[in-house]
Amino acid sequence: MKHVIMLYFIAAATLFSSCAKQDSEHRLITVKNSLDLPRAFETIEISKSDIQLHTGERFEDFSIQDVATKAILTSQFVDEDQDGTADVLLFQPELNPNSEKQFELVKVDGGVEVDSTVYCYSRFVPERTDDYTWENNKVAFRTYGPVAQKMVEDSLPGGTLSSGIDAWLKKVEYSIIDNWYAKNDKDPGYYHIDHGEGLDNFHVGSSRGVGGSAVKVDTSYYISKNFTDYKTITTGPIRTSFILKYADWDANEKTISEEKHISLDYGNNFSRFEIHVDGTDELSVGLTLHDNKGEITQNVDQGWIAYWESEYFDSELGTAIVAPKGVMTASEYYVTSMKDRSNLYAQLNVDNNKVVYYAGFAWKESKQYPTKASWEKYIQEFSEKLNTPLEVSIQ
């Protein structure tokens, strides 16, 4: 039995050598790269339904082995429907340009050591009002919940009324979320100062931050309030994912219902946003312009917009939105006198009440993409890989 799967782009993999028990039935996975680019940090998803399990076999007992090298790859199981059993197995191969590799599902010995460090992490943060914050080894983000909203509406200090996406500018690979919040609790303002790991000096306010959504009616943009509920799906070495729910909101007498399914994979500077939305056939997603001094680069036909701030707190910062080809229909450099409401917007087609896009950033101090040119090269290659996904067959 053979399945062919076209997979969307995102994530990373580390190789480890080990001994594996060979099953009597080989389950081979072939991954093909048809681009003239090396491929890494892209997540392959193997669904439990793709594998014919025999009586007594458990999906969770399998690992991924490189057929040629016999190395065991880092992998992660995900219980997507939260029923207590894994639905998907994730791994991240590395492929040369125009090449293919074979992998096998194997049962490894109990003593095999595989890196299971939780680089991709997210959680609800009740101790800091009620943020939801997420990160991988490259970047971190957060957004704001109902308590923060109510504090503003009740004129209490410390609240935030925003559905924008905040950027936490980390410059270390390890997880910083818990540490930053703990130290900020003891020393208020701690994470607004760089102590060697990075900082949060990114102003969101009511802007869209890095990829927040809006609905445009005539010449005006309408936005939701804070998220009202959340569900964490997974954290691990390859992916974190979660769901944010929002109360219905008004866009010039149009009722908008919105739910955000967000994931962030290892090795990527972009979060993936899958928005489930009713009430509109077009969604606008934006990048804050801050003081409007940045440079815009875009290729709407290819599905991306970018903003580079060369005078960002004695450093430089780039943000971007990327969508699959054909989803982005236009962009708008929207400047207004309303505080925090100036954004670079991408207009995205909603198909069957759903739209997918990616939003992220690069900070010069992280040394990941320290120049405008290197950031735009990454965006262009990300877009190319997104539109030419790795081909995966299972037999």
UniProtKB/Swiss-Prot annotation:
Keywords: Cell outer membrane, Lipoprotein, Membrane, Palmitate, Signal. It comes from Formosa agariphila (strain DSM 15362 / KCTC 12365 / LMG 23005 / KMM 3901 / M-2Alg 35-1). Residues 1-18 form the signal peptide. A lipid is attached at C19 (N-palmitoyl cysteine). It is found in: Cell outer membrane. It is a lipid-anchor. This is Uncharacterized protein P7. Pfam families: DUF4861 (PF16153). May be involved in ulvan degradation. Ulvan is the main polysaccharide component of the Ulvales (green seaweed) cell wall. It is composed of disaccharide building blocks comprising 3-sulfated rhamnose (Rha3S) linked to D-glucuronic acid (GlcA), L-iduronic acid (IduA), or D-xylose (Xyl). One of its GO terms (cellular component) is cell outer membrane. A lipid is attached at C19 (S-diacylglycerol cysteine). The keyword Lipoprotein applies. InterPro entries: DUF4861. The keyword S-adenosyl-L-methionine does not apply.
